[in-house]
Amino acid sequence: MTRVGVLLMNLGGPERIKDVGPFLYNLFSDPEIIRLPLPIFQKPLAWFISTLRSSKSQKAYQAIGGGSPLRRITEQQARELQSALRNRGINATSYVAMRYWHPFTESAVEDIKADNINEVVVLPLYPHFSISTSGSSFRELRRLREVDKEFQKLSIRCIRSWFDNTGYIASMAELIEQEISSCESPNAAHICFTAHGVPKSYVEEAGDPYKDEIQDCALLIIDKVEKSLGFSNSYTLSYQSRVGPEEWLKPYTEEVLEELGANGVKELIVVPISFVSEHIETLQEIDIEYKKIALNNGIINFRRVKALDTYPLFINGLADLVASCLSGPEISLDEAAKLPEKVKLYPQEKWQWGWNNSAEVWNGRVAMFVFIICFFELVIGNGPLHYIGLL
Amino acid sequence: MTRVGVLLMNLGGPERIKDVGPFLYNLFSDPEIIRLPLPIFQKPLAWFISTLRSSKSQKAYQAIGGGSPLRRITEQQARELQSALRNRGINATSYVAMRYWHPFTESAVEDIKADNINEVVVLPLYPHFSISTSGSSFRELRRLREVDKEFQKLSIRCIRSWFDNTGYIASMAELIEQEISSCESPNAAHICFTAHGVPKSYVEEAGDPYKDEIQDCALLIIDKVEKSLGFSNSYTLSYQSRVGPEEWLKPYTEEVLEELGANGVKELIVVPISFVSEHIETLQEIDIEYKKIALNNGIINFRRVKALDTYPLFINGLADLVASCLSGPEISLDEAAKLPEKVKLYPQEKWQWGWNNSAEVWNGRVAMFVFIICFFELVIGNGPLHYIGLL
């Protein structure tokens, strides 16, 4: 009987306060998170940002109990999914591979090899594809595969995105309906979908399908909710968790909350649409920061739809995904890891790869830029990184 | 039905080459591993040693495939033990808590709390108690419990050591017998028990029962082997993995190997007695370094008994331990974490706690000592740390 390994990929999160800095360093070291023209600056900048940013971030993790629950929840999801698949007669074992914290992808690959798995199904726990989430995880897995002959022998099938999965849509709709029904005036409640943002350039220049998938997904969910309840609620879709000076997908959730308050919304249901597990973005950013903004702007009843975690209908949807992936056409790791098109970094000036004039000019500019930033931050204790909200 | 959580404690090991340095830092930051008179020097010294030692250590991990298999094996042991306990009608879930690397004890505690466990059995995967292994893990768990009210509510029972466990002794004996039978002259083969060493002062000054338990354990195993085979093999017991300038338990394994070769031993069976999982000490130190010493000294047939890993008889022995712990008298975490007596650090001079003359004198001495070491190592690129084998 084929031994199937289901590799669940997610972001990872620090579980102890002292791990926050190293976690941030890993995150900002990824060129898919902060893009720089010369890779040589990646690690120093990652070190610099993570060092200066970690105390703020530590406070956020302190506020949710001292660490991220993501590993625990993801491992629970893995166990539940494994049981669901075995109940269907699929001899599956599930593994967890985090991108920026333990357990890392390397550990999962070692486990898969040791367990004599015949076929691997790669399932990112991001319903919507983005260069910076599923894309980064697929490419990490491909890097490990390139240098591991034993791993290369294994057949791999990938699930690239699954925002339209029936179980996922239905479980999101169910949880939203429960919150609507708990409102004083259910049909006057406003639904605020909030997704993790990405830089606008990812979508507009690099062709990241993320925004389209998020929009389609919100429509599918709202349609399901309306059909079930028999009435329509007003809704908005916005993006949260912006970092850095670049423009990200708009509207920003915090601005939408202010507008909704100003427009007289009294009962609000916030739906974290791109997160399937409770994490810092739901427990701290939405439940604490955004709630405060909402209440300050006149919203009285602030309700947040819980993340799916191990909601049985959702786990069943994941099992459907794995089952159809096994019987459907194979999507290779190369196809899944492929970027939509060449990412244009600086469209205003032609960029050339290699050690050439263009590179040297940019090298000088970036070095001066980073030097000035460091100078201000270190000497004056304030500067551009504080100004743009990175510190 | 009582939900039992079985907490398996072990050392932990880096799974990726880049994790070797941080792992060593964690290891040497533990005052149970390197004892200093003033805790303030602990972290700088840990940083210094781990930084300078990591490239040598990385090479060792490279030689065994790029990382430690300890997490993977320990999680396999956890799964097998869980199944064995459930087959006996005990509603058990097992958890892994590593002391110096991921998954850390904090993660296991979070999982235990989330799973609504009623009773925790703490089982160190060290058969023999030592201040620096089980002792350090018990105290780590106690520190976490002291600051966690939810965790304090949980009933905890500890297994302090289990070197005389029937399943453990029997499975060690079985594996040794297999190796003896594979020798050309089975009754002429020499058995070399090798245990992880500890500083002699732990045993002689602090009262660590480690050496006694190792000796008793070797006798139990050899007795079982003799009864089963019907003949006696010569055997020795020695200690490996010494680090630093201090005297450790003797004889040292490398010296014993030289002597055995000089005495004409041709077939040798090395038995890693204090390790229940394959790790750097078995796969690299014994299989590569000690094998080389043995072959260079005239030993022809060098055989190493495999670590127990998930050997069914061994897992069954662990299940016996958990079952009797649940029905037997309760050993609390405080009792398990207790040191045998106050550790005497510098018996040649009376040590007084607090900021007093004695502390200041030692402060000055240690600061000068560390400064001189750093100076030699950094400026000349060679010095005392190289000389004593730390680098």
UniProtKB/Swiss-Prot annotation, chains A, B:
SUPFAM superfamilies for this protein: Chelatase, Chlorophyll a-b binding protein
Family to which this protein belongs: Belongs to the ferrochelatase family.
GO cellular component: cytoplasm
Name used for this protein in its record: Ferrochelatase
Subcellular location: Cytoplasm
Binding positions (Fe cation): H196, E281
TM ranges: none
